[in-house]
Structure formats: structure tokens, C-alpha cells
């Protein structure tokens, strides 16, 4: 393979990566590296594919090797920083992003990525500064806008935060659904609107506190939610028409229906949660009374305090490491007198002795099963998960163990969204130290 052929192959690899055809691109990359093992561009391609495949440790090695060949390449320093970011090595990531900015002070991606790492470290003021520097370089840099939103929202600057948050709709983390020729809802009254879920299950529950506000000012409200929430939302919002089809194609109920406007559920707060006093914090979900009776009968037969517990949450991108409790961590709970612990975790691989498990409820495809269980507990304690959102939304006493690095929604001294949720911060302590100091 001569140099001209190499350039042609690299163009083909680049085109395949743009089309996200990584499995086709990788054999070509291997072929190039066999003949040109020091080619920085091809090493970068390989690193990018590993990064997109959620294998940041492999990506890190390729980017580092590429930088040995091209130490003045600003994009490579940013890529190395991104790999460190995905590995939760945020201080190292920021160092590499700043190196990239040093090479080119007008490079928006360097500041934008730095702001993302600062957000993950809950350093809101610094994240805001970095995001604004990125936007000075490129006012349309979407990730910087999202990081700026997180910073504002963490500090309770609701109007500014929701304005930036709204710009992220349609991006990687907030999928936008379009049903016809309807417009995005601007909060106008007396309209027929469709509210759709756009993130995870916990996010749908979290933002659902705004649904009653939307119903109150609209002519008619349709809700297109996750199928697991359909029954729970139908009961909780009887004035709305609810369908659990947001992840489906060719949806029949849409035939013959015209909407005036659509709104992602995460877009509702910009209309209804604009200042501290606009958060009612009241319970807004209603569990199935018949399924509740089953759990009530069981728990009454125990004649003990029944506490729900969550010991794991999130993914490697959402601080799963910080949102994890071991048997040793929860040992103080296991020693509580006249108390039974019930797991609210799902897809449990290793059970903890002394904890009760009901997978037919927690792993159910119908979240009504989980909600009914939660509704009859005396309280819930654990790391932040969908179950904790559900618990607080049902009005159950909920203690949320907030890791040192946490999302913007847990940055307030108290949780404005749920008056039934108490935030307990880890700070620099171990989880066992935190739990040992809880007074039940």
C-alpha cells in the first residue's frame, strides 16, 4: 500500500465512521496499521471506534500512541481527554483538554469537553466558566449549551437553565419525536398537545410532576410514554390520554389525530418550574390499589418495619461506581432491630444475605408492579435510581444517598421536586460511614 492508496483507504475509513459502520471500518484500520503501525490518523480512527463502542480503556491507548507521533495535534489531546472522562479520570481529562486549548485558544471543543468533566465532578461554577468559554468560540456548540444548563440548574437559576436545556432537545441525550406538522409547544393555553418521554424511565417520572400543570391549561393532553409506565400514568393522570408507545414505530392510535403542538417531557419545566416557589413537591403518582393490597397483607404478616433499599444505579456514564453499595456498606441497615429490608434493585446478579428480593415486581415490564410494592413500604433508602424517584412521587418517605459526584438535580440543599425526599450527601465519606450515622 503506497501513500496514495493509504489516503484513499483513510478517506473510506472516515466515511464509514461517519456512517457509524464501525464493524466495516475496523478491518480496514487493521490492514493499514499492519503496514503503517505509526500512522497517527489511523490510530486515531481506531481509538474513536473503541470510544464509541464504550471501551474507553482501549481508546485511551490508541490516542496516547497517536500523540507520540503528533504531539501538536489539538484534536488528539481532546480525544485522549474524552477517553479519560469515560474512565472517570476527570482531573486527567481536564489536563488534556487544557493542553488542547493551549495549542489553539479558539478551539471550542476543548472548553466544552472540560465543562463536561467539571459537570461530572459537580464543580458547577467552573463548569459554567468553561462552557461560556466554549460558546465564545462557537455559539452553537451544543454540548457546551447542555453543560451550561446543568450548571445553571444546579444553582437554582431556573429560567436561565431551562433556556439552555431546551437547546439540547434533538441531540444525543434528548431524542425529539415528531408526529406530524405540529410545532414545538411554547406553553400556550387551550391547545391539544402530545407530551412524550425522551430519556430514561427515572427521567420520565421525575418530569411527570409537571404533567398536571400542562393538563390544567390545555384543551387536551396526550402522553406518549415508556410502555412500562402506561398503567401507572393512566391512573395518575386520568384527564390525559396515555399510550406507552414512545419507542414503537407504526403506532395505530395516531391515525386521524392532529396535535397543535408537541413537547418533550423534559421541556415542561421551562413553563412550570421557573422559580423556587413553583415547585409543589407533592406526590403525583398513584399505585394500583389492588396490587397494593397484596403487599400490605404480606408486610402486615411480618409485623416489622419494612424498608426498601436500592444498592446500584446508573451506567458507567452516569457514575455507576459512585451509585453502588456493598454488603459491608449496608451492614448497619442489616442490624436494625425489627426491620426487614426489601430490595428495589432490578436485574440483580448477586443477592445480599438478609435482604428480601421480589424480582417478579422489580424486574416486571409493568412498572405498576414495582410501584405497588414501593407504595406499601414504610420508607425507602438508597442510591438514586428510578425506584427512588417513584417512591418520592408516590409520597413514600425517601432518603436518597447522594454521591460526592452527582447530577444537577441533587445539587440543592433540599430536593424541591419531592417534599418526601431527603438528600443525604456522601461528601468525602465512605458509604458505610454515611449509613452508620443515619438515625432511623
Task: Name every feature range the model reports, one short phrase each.
Residues 1-379, 384-440:
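Alpha-helical solenoid repeat scaffolds of the TPR/TPR-like class and their adjacent stem/linker regions
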Amino acid at each position: 500500500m503506497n501513500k496514495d492508496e493509504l489516503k484513499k483507504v483513510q478517506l473510506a475509513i472516515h466515511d464509514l465512521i461517519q456512517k457509524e459502520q464501525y464493524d466495516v471500518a475496523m478491518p480496514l484500520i487493521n490492514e493499514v496499521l499492519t503496514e503503517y503501525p505509526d500512522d497517527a490518523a489511523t490510530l486515531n480512527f481506531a481509538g474513536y471506534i473503541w470510544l464509541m463502542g464504550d471501551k474507553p480503556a482501549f481508546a485511551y491507548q490508541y490516542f496516547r500512541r497517536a500523540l507520540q507521533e503528533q504531539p501538536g495535534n489539538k484534536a488528539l489531546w481532546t480525544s485522549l481527554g474524552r477517553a479519560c472522562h469515560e474512565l472517570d479520570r476527570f482531573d486527567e481529562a481536564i489536563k488534556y483538554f487544557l493542553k488542547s486549548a493551549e495549542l489553539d485558544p479558539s478551539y471550542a471543543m476543548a472548553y466544552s469537553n472540560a465543562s463536561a468533566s467539571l459537570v461530572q465532578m459537580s464543580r458547577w461554577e467552573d463548569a459554567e466558566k468553561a462552557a461560556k468559554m466554549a460558546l465564545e468560540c462557537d455559539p452553537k456548540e451544543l454540548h457546551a449549551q447542555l453543560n451550561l444548563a446543568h450548571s445553571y440548574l444546579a444553582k437554582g437559576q431556573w429560567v436561565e437553565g431551562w433556556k439552555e436545556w431546551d437547546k439540547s432537545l434533538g441531540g444525543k441525550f434528548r431524542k425529539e419525536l415528531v408526529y406530524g406538522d405540529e410545532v414545538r409547544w411554547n406553553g400556550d393555553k387551550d391547545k391539544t398537545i402530545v407530551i412524550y418521554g425522551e430519556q430514561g424511565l427515572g427521567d420520565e417520572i421525575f418530569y411527570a410532576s409537571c404533567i398536571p400543570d400542562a393538563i390544567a391549561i390545555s384543551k387536551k393532553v396526550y402522553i406518549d410514554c415508556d410502555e412500562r409506565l402506561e398503567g401507572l400514568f393512566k391512573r395518575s393522570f386520568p384527564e390525559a390520554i396515555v399510550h406507552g408507545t414512545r419507542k414503537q414505530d407504526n403506532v395505530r392510535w395516531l391515525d386521524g389525530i392532529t396535535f397543535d403542538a408537541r413537547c418533550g417531557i423534559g421541556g415542561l419545566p421551562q413553563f412550570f418550574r421557573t422559580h423556587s416557589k413553583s415547585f409543589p413537591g407533592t406526590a403525583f403518582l398513584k399505585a394500583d390499589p389492588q396490587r397494593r393490597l397484596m403487599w400490605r397483607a404480606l408486610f402486615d404478616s411480618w409485623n416489622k418495619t419494612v424498608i426498601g433499599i436500592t444498592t446500584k444505579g446508573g451506567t458507567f456514564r452516569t457514575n455507576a461506581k459512585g451509585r453502588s453499595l456493598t454488603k459491608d456498606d449496608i451492614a448497619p441497615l442489616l442490624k436494625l432491630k425489627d426491620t426487614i429490608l426489601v430490595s428495589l434493585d432490578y436485574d440483580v446478579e448477586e443477592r445480599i444475605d438478609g435482604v428480601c428480593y421480589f424480582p417478579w415486581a422489580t424486574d416486571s415490564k409493568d412498572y405498576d408492579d414495582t410501584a405497588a410494592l414501593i407504595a406499601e413500604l414504610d420508607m425507602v433508602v438508597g442510591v438514586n435510581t428510578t425506584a427512588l424517584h417513584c417512591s418520592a412521587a408516590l409520597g413514600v418517605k425517601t432518603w436518597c444517598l447522594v454521591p460526592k459526584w452527582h447530577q444537577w438535580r441533587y445539587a440543592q440543599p433540599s430536593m424541591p421536586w419531592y417534599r418526601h425526599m431527603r438528600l443525604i450527601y456522601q461528601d468525602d465519606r465512605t458509604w458505610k460511614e454515611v449509613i452508620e450515622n443515619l438515625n432511623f
